[in-house]
Swiss-Prot record:
Organism: Shouchella clausii (strain KSM-K16)
UniProt free text on domains: ValRS has two distinct active sites: one for aminoacylation and one for editing. The misactivated threonine is translocated from the active site to the editing site. The C-terminal coiled-coil domain is crucial for aminoacylation activity.
InterPro entries linked: aa-tRNA-synth_I_CS, aa-tRNA-synth_Ia, Anticodon_Ia_Val, M/V/L/I-tRNA-synth_anticd-bd, Rossmann-like_a/b/a_fold, tRNA-bd_arm, tRNAsynth_Ia_anticodon-bd, Val-tRNA_synth_C_sf
Keyword field contains Ligase: yes
Gene3D superfamilies named among the record's database cross-references: HUPs, Isoleucyl-tRNA Synthetase, Domain 1, Valyl-tRNA synthetase, C-terminal domain, Valyl/Leucyl/Isoleucyl-tRNA synthetase, editing domain
Protein name, entry field: Valine--tRNA ligase
Coiled coil: 809-846
Annotated gene: valS
Source organism phylogeny: Bacteria, Bacillati, Bacillota, Bacilli, Bacillales
Length: 880
């Protein structure tokens, strides 16, 4: 697009953002080209669930990736940022079932096929919604390559992996204790269980010996499971019970006889040293049961109610059963103590239901061999996955070293149906990518795979694998970086690494960049229950996407949590306005000035040379920091350069040339200003894409879009050390003069005398070169610069680097009047200090006032004391 030299008075994000995102998509600027002359760079987006709105965490995650994608694209890489979404088995099915319930329909009323049709309708609706939200944030993904975890290509990959692992003996079907969600009636993997501290009880009871010779004491937090007890275990070396090993006890209520067994697992020091063994309802008891060939008595149904094995409790909810059993045990006088007990209880991550350890036949991945192979990648620099920050590598390694087999079957309809069939007559199992040829004689397993099974294949399945000749797979895999939160290192990162190693022979990504969680201003995790969540759309509507993005990018360091403050988003909005106004000023002084007129090699002023040098330093720093994933620091460097160097200093100094009569100086400054703004907008673009595109299109420029403009490169020929030294001297001098004017209430419009004593002739020459700037910024009536300058009487003095500054007070202000004003101010400050000291010496106040109020008073005391000291010193100077 051609530049337009007039800009609106105010920046309007709502109009600008939609315009430019549409323009970018139409121009296909985000699409990877496969250009063999360019080096590939790839990222796959962590696929959001098709269950609803994206939250601030998604916006943060996406902003970080977009900074990388936009930067690399501008640096000339063939950049692929591949988008997609996750089918999110349990979560989506629960949402669809909930929607059906509102219409009085259950999934069973519809049947599997019709229910899946409804689920796909849900997916299509929410996928569109997610794309709209991505557009609002401004992310530069390649929509032409968008994938979904249930699309055909990914389904083929899932089948390939399942069948391969099964044939290698790494997927098996067996009866084990699994985590069971009675609400959704499905198995859960260990990392889908959230542990919460719950106030419960220890129930101490005695099981009578069958021979009537006594009893043995046991304790449990789940008395309802005693109905499934098949033994009592003691430690073989526990002298208290050695004479009882092999004897039988009679199970209260049930009346079933069960043995007392010896097992090393039992902790002699815990409780009575004897434990009830329920192999069908506890994972440790299950292992003990296997060692001792104990029967497995399952006493619950899948919905958490008691089954026929529970006898008279059949049909009762498990927790109601617990209450009734306690009453019945008390009636039998075998329950002799109930002890309060705070313990950690597993809850379903999705439904919130208390998870039940449950005996069930499920499909599992044998994890130990896969984990060991994945960990070998970390042994060599050219194969390892680099974690940023590095400390998270240990989180990953610890998880993999202590990993348990992964339960991958889920009792759902929405998901990848397990590619296993059972012969209707022989019950033979067939596992394959295609159904058996005589499919009428077989029934397919009704369960689906854990959502994370397909997500674990995301980096390579999205690139066309298992076709290893697929162009995208050959060019863009392995990917360069994965950006994700520390909370899913175990859930997702570890699984992608072991599947990547198992099926592609290499790491799925070179780096893993870990960020934290977004919290509210008080440091609390955002949640529905606290009502402290913030919708990114609300932020964008109020301040624009760029303000939100810049806040998210600069608000934290890698691996750490980010606190959300509306005030900080507002400050980034102010930053955007500062950039806008600076650009408007520049364009107002560029009438008739085009891109071809830019010439930064002509004679330049000190300010021109200084800002070009600062630009090179900023280019070097920002590029290095982005490469190191230090986006916060990169943003702060840009902020300081734009706000302080460009806006507060250079633009003000540029006015000397722009408003002057020297046409050559005017053209040089125009060139430098245009160049600096162009290069600055390019560096800022990955952080704030919309406003930078809008400004860049108005500036003299070349090319269709800043999105594909070249990234700035450090240029040593534009570094002017002498100009930097000149400017540092001038800035410190001007700052000291402005500070003195402010302290003495002398307005800038009032001319004052300035006397400067440089320490040597070199500094004197430096100041003489900058006289025009001193006169503009200091407004002197007299400017005297001399190495042999005599110290004037009655003058404010400042010892600066390489010089002394004197501001004669005569003519600058009425000394007597100023002293009187300061003494009046001192009197007020003395009274305030006295009032606060009296309050802080009052024991009643200290005892009753909240601690934060006391701290506020102490802070005021220090503030007033510091102000008082400054006024005392100022009075002394004026009287001297």
């Amino acid at each position: 697009m051609e530049e337009q030299h007039s800009m609106p008075t105010k920046y309007d994000p709502s109009a600008t953002e939609k315009k430019w995102y549409t323009y970018w998509l139409k121009g296909k600027f985000f699409e990877a080209t496969g250009d063999p002359d360019k080096q590939p760079y790839s990222i796959v987006i962590p696929p959001p669930n098709v269950t609803g709105k994206l939250h601030l965490g998604h916006a943060w995650d996406a902003t970080i990736q977009d900074i990388l994608a936009r930067t690399k694209r501008m640096q000339g890489y063939d950049t692929l940022w591949l988008p997609g979404m996750d089918h999110a088995g349990i979560a989506t099915q629960a949402k669809v079932e909930g929607k059906l319930r509102e219409q009085g329909i259950s999934k069973y009323d519809l049947g599997r096929e019709a229910f899946l049709e409804k689920s796909w309708e849900w997916k299509d609706e929410y996928a569109k919604f997610i794309r709209e939200q991505w557009a609002k944030v401004g992310i530069s993904v390649d929509y032409s390559r968008e994938r979904f975890t249930l699309d055909q290509g990914l389904s083929d990959a899932v089948k390939e992996v399942f069948v391969s692992l099964y044939n290698k003996g790494l997927i098996y079907r067996g009866e084990y204790i699994i985590n069971w969600d009675p609400q959704t009636k499905t198995a859960l993997s260990d990392i889908e269980v959230i542990y919460k501290d719950v106030q419960g009880a220890f129930y101490h009871m005695s099981y009578p010996l069958s021979d009537g010779s006594g009893s043995i004491e046991i304790a449990t937090t789940r008395p309802e499971t005693m109905l499934g007890d098949t033994a009592v275990a003691v430690h073989p070396d526990d002298e208290r019970y050695q004479h009882l090993i092999g004897k039988m006890v009679k199970l209260p209520i049930v009346g079933r006889e069960i043995p007392i067994i010896a097992d090393d697992y039992v902790d002699r020091e815990f409780g009575s040293g004897a434990v009830k063994i329920t192999p069908a309802h506890d994972p440790n008891d299950f292992e003990i049961g296997n060692r001792h060939n104990l029967p497995r008595v399952l006493v619950m149904n899948e919905d958490g109610t008691m089954n026929e094995k529970a006898g008279k409790y059949e049909g009762m909810d498990r927790f109601e059963c617990r209450k009734q059993i306690v009453k019945d045990l008390q009636a039998q006088q075998v329950l002799f103590k109930i002890e309060d007990h705070l313990h950690s209880v597993g809850h379903s991550e999705r439904s919130g239901a208390v998870v039940e350890p449950y005996l069930s036949t499920q499909w599992f991945v044998k994890m130990r061999p896969l984990a060991e192979e994945a960990l070998k990648l970390q042994e060599y620099a050219d194969t390892k996955v680099t974690f940023v920050p590095q400390r998270f590598e240990q989180t990953y390694i610890r998880w993999m070293e202590n990993i348990r087999d992964w339960c991958i079957s889920r009792q759902l309809w929405w998901g990848h149906q397990i590619p296993a069939w059972y012969h209707k007559e022989t019950n033979e199992i067939y596992v394959g990518k295609e159904p058996p040829r005589d499919s009428e004689n077989w029934r397919q397993d009704e369960d689906v795979l854990d959502t994370w099974f397909s997500s674990a294949l995301w980096p390579f399945s999205t690139m066309g694998w298992p076709d290893e000749e697929a162009p995208d797979y050959k060019r863009y895999y392995p990917t360069n970086v994965l950006v994700t939160g520390y909370d899913i290192i175990a859930f997702w990162v570890s699984r992608m690494i072991f599947q990547g190693k198992a099926f592609t022979g290499q790491r799925p990504f070179k780096d893993v960049l870990i960020h934290g969680l977004i919290r509210d201003a008080e440091g609390r995790k955002m949640s529905k229950s606290l009502g402290n969540g913030v919708d990114p759309q609300e932020v964008i509507d109020k301040y624009g996407a760029d303000s939100l993005r810049f806040f998210l990018a600069t608000g934290s360091t890698p691996g750490n949590d980010l606190r959300f403050y509306w005030e900080k988003v507002e400050s980034t909005w102010n930053f955007g306005n500062k950039i806008w106004n600076a650009s408007r000023f520049a364009l107002m002084n560029m009438d008739g000035f085009s891109y071809s007129d830019i010439d930064i090699n002509q004679e330049k002023s000190i300010a021109d040379k200084w800002i070009l040098t600062r630009l090179q330093e900023t280019v070097e720093s920002v590029t290095r920091l982005i490469d190191a994933y230090e986006f916060g620091e990169a943003g702060r460097v840009l902020y300081s350069f734009i706000w302080d160097d460009v806006c507060d200093w250079y633009i003000e100094m540029a006015k000397l040339a722009l408003y002057g009569e020297n046409e050559q100086a005017k053209q040089a400054t125009r060139s430098v200003l245009a160049h600096v703004l162009d290069q600055t907008m390019r560096m800022l673009h990955p952080f704030m894409p919309f406003i930078t595109e809008e400004i860049w299109q108005h500036l003299p420029h070349e090319g269709e879009s800043i999105t594909v403009a070249n990234w700035p490169v450090y240029d040593q020929s534009l570094v002017f050390e002498e100009a930097v030294e000149d400017m540092e001297a001038l800035k410190s001098l001007i700052h000291a003069i402005r500070t003195t004017r402010s302290e003495l209430n002398v307005p800038m419009s009032k001319q004052i005398e300035l006397k400067i004593r440089p320490q040597d002739e070199q500094m004197a020459a430096r100041l003489q070169r900058g006289v025009a700037y001193i006169e503009k910024f200091a407004n002197p009536s007299l400017l005297d610069i001399a190495v042999d300058l005599a110290t004037p009487e009655k003058a404010m003095s400042h010892a600066l680097s390489g010089m002394e500054l004197f501001l004669p007070l005569a003519g600058m202000l009425d000394l007597d009047k100023e002293v009187a004003r300061l003494e009046k101010e001192l009197d007020k400050l003395n009274k305030e200090v006295e009032r606060i000291e009296k309050k802080l010496n009052n024991q009643g106040f200290l005892a009753k006032a909240p601690s934060h109020v006391v701290e506020e008073e102490k802070a005021k005391q220090q503030d007033y004391a510091a102000k008082r000291q400054t006024v005392i010193e100022r009075i002394a100077e004026l009287k001297a």
